[in-house]
Amino acid sequence: MTLAGANQSEIPRPVAFARNAARYAGLLFDYFTQYAKVQLGYRGDFIVSLITSFAATIFGLAFVLILFRKAPQLAGWNLPEELFLYGFSLIPYGVFNILAGNLYNFGNDYIIEGKFDRILLRPISSLFQILFETFRIEAVQGIATGLFCMWWGAHRLHVAWTFEKLALLIFFGICASVIYLSIFLILTTASFWFEDRIGIHPPVWNVIAFGRYPLSIYSGAVQFVLCWIIPFGLASFYPSVRLLGRAVVPEYAPFVPVVAAVFLAIAISLWNFGTRHYSSTGS
């Protein structure tokens, strides 16, 4: 039997995977194209959003600079090292903001308003639609600012950017982004059972700031939470330590991809469970 006449179950898995990957890549391009058209129609709003986003990033950096004017070191970290850590933390934060803004308002926009029914009617992954129906391109400035802070800190510390170190930067950046996405996806799934317009995202969102500083400034209990419960600290601190070549005890950098994989698996499992048990609001 030819491939064209074969049943879907008879198609080799690599071929089926390639077809699905190509299909979703095309859908992603379509989503982004549609988003770009909308933004071109509202350029003023986009510029205001970009300025507002950039101002928030600069405000956070200004706080760090003021802090180090008062104290030249923070738990043994100087300003260039802290800016490197701060800059790295902005990368997964920016990636999350670009791709997953819908998660923050999922309970209100999709569950309470009933838009999730429309999502489920389409023969496309519901999670894919939620993640990529909208983008926040203005959040790219956060990634750019983070890379600049890392470059400046590395330059002042005379850090040599070898191919291995660049590969580690990309690898840890992806892992950290997955951790951020997974944490908020886990929180988002609570909306399937507890209908609330605001949800539980805001207090956890504020915890992100704790991962932008050396974990050694916190108590052991707080460090545990930031590494294993809400691992924003693990996602930012230990990759920065590895990239800077600093020695810390314990060394948890090897656990970053493990935690990313575990949290992603939990998040996807909860999402699938939630969609299977979803009851329409009837809106």
Residues covered by each model-derived region:
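Hydrophobic transmembrane alpha-helices and immediately adjacent juxtamembrane helices
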Residues: T2-S283
